[in-house]
Amino acid sequence: IFKNDRKEFEEKWDDLKIFINYGMLTQEDFYEKANKFALLKDTDDKYYTYEEYQSLIKDNQTDKDGNLIYLYATHADEQYSYIDAAKNKGYNVLLMDGQLDVAMVSMLEQKFEKSRFTRVDSDVIDRLIAKEERKDASLEVGQRDILSSVFRSQLPQMKKVEFNVETQSLGETGTPIMITQSEYMRRMKEMANIQAGMSFYGEMPDMFNLVLNVDHKLVKQVLNDADNSCKAALEPIEAEMTSLNKRHDELHKAQEGKKADEIPQAEKDELSDVEKKLADEKTKKEAVLGEYAGGNKVIRQLIDLALLQNNMLKGEALTNFVKRSIELI
């Protein structure tokens, strides 16, 4: 059919795909034959052979290290905003929503030379295909800590879900906040569902990144307001932490190159005491920022928008979001 009627073959591909992919996954000799006619489907419902697709994306989707990046989505509607952002950068996105596509992605990465498959929601758009060295967020360490703390304090508690908060410079017109999930960890968990011996990954919590765009006016507004509102309460805490960190570094330096039995017990005890005091001061700092964040509706609204975009806002949290949205309007 492929040779005689390409259009008909494309129309039948979605039905044939699972059988052809299964054959390619289980029989090496079948892969050698099928890779000439097997198709990839993009989010615009266009079909390409492997060779055709490689030619389509090689100019625009090759990273700075020479790797060809195949972007893909697993659900066109749920991942629409990420797909749209990729298209706006001139990228093409594959639709890999089949039953065997998780395994196919891993196999094709091994078969295709210098190629990598990356799900479109696994990182911010500027890092999906690294064209140049990453631009660090234009904030001081203290400012990043404040932003991370206020947003982390308002993240919901979800079963087997963990969030890491990070700051990035994504431009003034970029989205203020978004959630991404590591390609590696997500794929390992998906493989655990279909492959024996990988149950360890299946038991691990889902790890997500909450990315704050420090260039966006709303994030800047939160930072400025938090800085001004908490300044008086934080100053004595930060002064104490600076003093403790200095002493901590001095003790560490004094112990460098020494064996455990060569370090006086008094120094060991002091180092332990300093570390405990540092942890206590950090807890105080986070409590101050958490109390501020609890009264800032913009922070909770931004977090809920990111959760909503990823279909992670449900039940009471969704109802509260709707009520808060009406209040803010």
Label each PLM-derived region with a short phrase.
Residues 1-329:
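Conserved GHKL (Bergerat-fold) ATPase module
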